[in-house]
Design a protein with these regions (language model features):
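Glycine-rich phosphate/pyrophosphate-binding beta-alpha loops
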Residues: 17-49, 123-127
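Residue-level detector of well-ordered alpha-helical segments, enriched
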Residues: 8-11, 29, 48-52, 67, ...
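Short alpha-helical scaffolding segments that buttress acidic/His motifs in well-ordered protein cores
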Residues: 12-19, 53, 89, 93, ...
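Gly/Pro-rich interdomain helix-loop hinge
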Residues: 40-111
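Short, amphipathic C-terminal "tail helix"
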Residues: 109-149
Length: 149
């Protein structure tokens, strides 16, 4: 929005570095699902991650209240509850006009089971903070296709 704003650009640089550190800690279900969607439908990985993010957050965050408080604080959100955190993330996604479902970028419902099965074989799946069964991953994929937010 403000390419000449050095403070904002510096903040993005720090965020990029933190993202790299997070990458080393493990990627989880957002990436596992996105890897498989991208492989089959040639979607942009970052966009696919952004679409899937709210669905997986809803699945993961109830078991991560302490981390949600730290993330909310770092993002300067006033309310540190799980639901407020997800709501704030969704507002950001809306603001930058991220599609609200994978179907909007050409992913059909018919692939949900196949994507879920493949996602569970992805190395990123093993680092998800909450274990998920096939049925749970299938529901996450289907929700992401129909209406992620």
């Amino acid at each position: 929005e403000e390419p000449q704003n050095l403070a904002a650009r510096g903040g993005m640089l720090v965020a990029s570095c933190l993202g790299g550190i997070a990458f080393l800690k493990g990627l989880g279900l957002v990436h596992a699902i996105s890897h498989m969607v991208g492989a089959e439908y040639n979607t942009h990985h970052g966009l696919t991650n952004a679409i899937v993010l709210p669905v997986v957050l809803r699945f993961n965050l109830p078991t991560m209240e302490e981390k949600v408080k730290r993330m909310s604080d770092a993002m300067q959100f006033d309310d540190h509850s799980v639901e407020s955190f997800i709501s704030n993330i969704e507002k950001i996604l809306d603001r930058i006009q991220i599609p609200q479902s994978l179907s909007e970028i050409g992913v059909p419902e018919s692939c949900a089971a196949r994507i879920a099965e493949k996602a569970m074989q992805d190395l990123a799946y093993a680092t998800n903070p909450r274990l998920a069964t096939f049925e749970e991953v299938h529901k996450l994929v289907l929700a992401s296709i129909k209406k992620a937010r």
